[in-house]
């Protein structure tokens, strides 16, 4: 019976396709885990929507994943984590629920040496102040500087990962953070890990915190602690569900995932 519990999938969800960077990190860190991904591609972006709407959409996704008997959930969306994280945890009870903001904040605090942390994220995540709150809960003396970097999202989706336009945009966004003397930078949007090489070069000696990797590490730790790690599965099952299959979805999705997407299925929620 215990083994059946361990074989249950991890549910990962996002408002769109950015959360596939989290799936990729989970596949690498936990290669024996079955994974179900849901991306709400019909209703993306969430960032411009009200708190009530984001909570409502998030609950629909959580219900969908619960129907698929997941053993844990990963909120692979900074907006959902910031706005609806608490409500999701209330709904799921004792089930482990991981999220990119908690994991990113924890890793940033463990990384910084001078107690000055920068965050680049979308407008909604920056305005929610969720990263600063998560960091200050653990260390109120840390200087947290946030910078909205919305233009990087379409550049990543266009595949301009090393383009001069992207480099110049990154430079502009980093300027105020570097001027404040940060030594650690959190990539606070699920699209940004794809720009890690470029951001790393432009940020110099600043340590980069990749929320996808830190969330995968935290997931591994929690599953082990709860006795839910799958240690006997050489042929894991990966399923991808979306609420719409927009133009170029597979191309962009496979870029994020770093591999082909076999099973993509469209479902409508709500």
Curated annotation (Swiss-Prot):
The active site is at residues 77, 189. Substrate binds at residues 14-15, 46-47, 78-79, 190-191. Keywords: Cell shape, Cell wall biogenesis/degradation, Isomerase, Peptidoglycan synthesis. Disulfide bonds: none annotated. It catalyses: L-glutamate = D-glutamate. InterPro entries: Asp/Glu/hydantoin_racemase (IPR015942), Asp/Glu_race (IPR001920), Asp/Glu_racemase_AS_2 (IPR033134), Glu_race (IPR004391). Its EC number is 5.1.1.3. It comes from the Bacteria. PROSITE patterns: ASP_GLU_RACEMASE_2. Pathway: Cell wall biogenesis; peptidoglycan biosynthesis. NCBIfam families: glut_race. Provides the (R)-glutamate required for cell wall biosynthesis. HAMAP family: Glu_racemase (MF_00258). Belongs to the aspartate/glutamate racemases family. This is Glutamate racemase.
